[in-house]
Amino acid sequence: KRTYYPVPDNKRMIVAVEKDSEQPIVLAGLHMKHPATPFAQKGQTAYVRDGYIENLITAMLSERLTALKQINPSPVLSASARTGSFLVAQTKEAFSLSFGCKEDNIRGSFRAVIGETERARRFGFTATELQRAKADALQRAQTRFAERNERSNRTLAMQAVRHFLSSEPLLTPEDRLALTKRFDAEVSLKEVNEAARKLISNENQVLTVLAPQKAGFTLPSNQELEQYVLQAQADNSYQPYKEEPLPTTLIEHAPKAGTIVSEQPYGHFGVTKLVLSNGIEVYVKPTNFAADQITMRLWGEGGLSLCPETDAPNFSFLPNAIVDGGVGAFSADRLDKMLAGKHVRVSPYVGQETQGISGQSNRKDLATMFQLAYLYFTAPRTDTTAFATSIDRRRAMLRNRNANPQVEYNDSLSLIAYGHNERTAPMTLERLNKVNYQRIMQLYRERFADATGFKMLLVGNVNIDSLRPLLCQYVASLPAAGRKESFANNLPEVRNVNETHVFTKKMNTPSALVTIIYTFDLPYTPKSNLALDALRRVLTIAFTDSIREEKGGAYGVGVQGELDCNSR
């Protein structure tokens, strides 16, 4: 017989604080408890509908909380909202806020997150916010429906486990999509805002705080932390949320289209090769492994190998500083809003030997994927405020970074393996002070100034007839002035030495970590790379069986292996 332990209600806030010398930042959680839905009611449509509304509320609030990180200086390191079980209890559910605080302004972090939540409770959400949240919910249901035949065994098993243990309804993707469409039409802004006022109750509250324990840092008392919450909830200065209207298109003026110079079969695997007027080679491989998914990669040689070593501190912010700044006329926040309801992800990257843009979309949003790729290539947006807040957050994280023994171990391992090479050195406060935003933007623009020699690979459920005009409009139009580049042979390699390094660090829970690195000379071929992967898998199984299972000598054993296809 399963025993369900009751969780009592409380009038006064419960404050629970824990300090740990290995905790890097101050993490706070505010939970507003309410009765759990009885198991017998979870099979009703009303339960699924309530869950749909709660998901809309937390999605809209989390969007607002994420925007707090764009303020300079940012009042928080991170923030999000959720609903569900209260910690591990089955008899209580809760609306929960989770946020990382600034050590030097914990009160300000509390006020920012709880204040934004209180503003939503008092004044509700806007029609445009609800429209975006509904669009995202519908898009997710449509994606699950399209991929219903590709669900993993684990996904099906976990759904059965949740049904058995918690009476969660067993809904098929068809059921979920039909209900989402129905709720999309039924649920009004008034209903959502009324539900938000009930969910964000400011009652039956529990505050949890996990903080570093270190010299020079004093956490406010439990009473002070409680007052931070109550004062933020009682503040009368909040105003209704407002936002500027969004444009209707990502690109105001479409670029001048290029052309397709040639098109022909390539190899023996159903690949089509197209050469565009700017020289970019495009390889298209139609597949039906996923019902509605197209993956794209656009890349050229060069990467960080062509950037001077003196810029190594800036490398850590490529491409995050670009993504944080947005593209074209859109800040990162407004770009996310613009993409509501679309199944598309696009991100630039600058690796050691290549730079490029990767993306994924469904067939409906294929044009959006190409538009974003074009913008990241030609119109990265400078946003000094977003970068300053990013630096501020990174600095706050670095102050206590070495409190975690695993982090210090990994840093030491990297420094030893690569001989303290600047290009692989971990980020520190000293290195952070050398980071220059203008130089980061300059490096990025240099890497994407010329598309000569770039290649594109498209794999998925793609129709080449609908693909051609998009290639002409957004890929053949990329600038190509004839600059031919390859990567430089200056990348750090693991030292070929026979050394043993032992170091100790005081830990709350003592444990030992052992890493053994082997290097060997082996020419890269697809066959040898596959053989190495097979060896890695076999050794992982063998070591786990012998070292962990039979001898109980380790928590776990991992084996990694890699061949460098560009090694010279």
PLM ranges: what are they?
Residues K1-N72, Q131-A135, Q142, R162-P308, ...:
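Proteolytic maturation boundary segments
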Residues F448-A449:
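Flexible, low-complexity linker/tail segments at the boundary of structured domains
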Residues L539-F543:
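Short Ser/Thr-interspersed hydrophobic loop/turn segments at strand-loop and sheet-helix junctions
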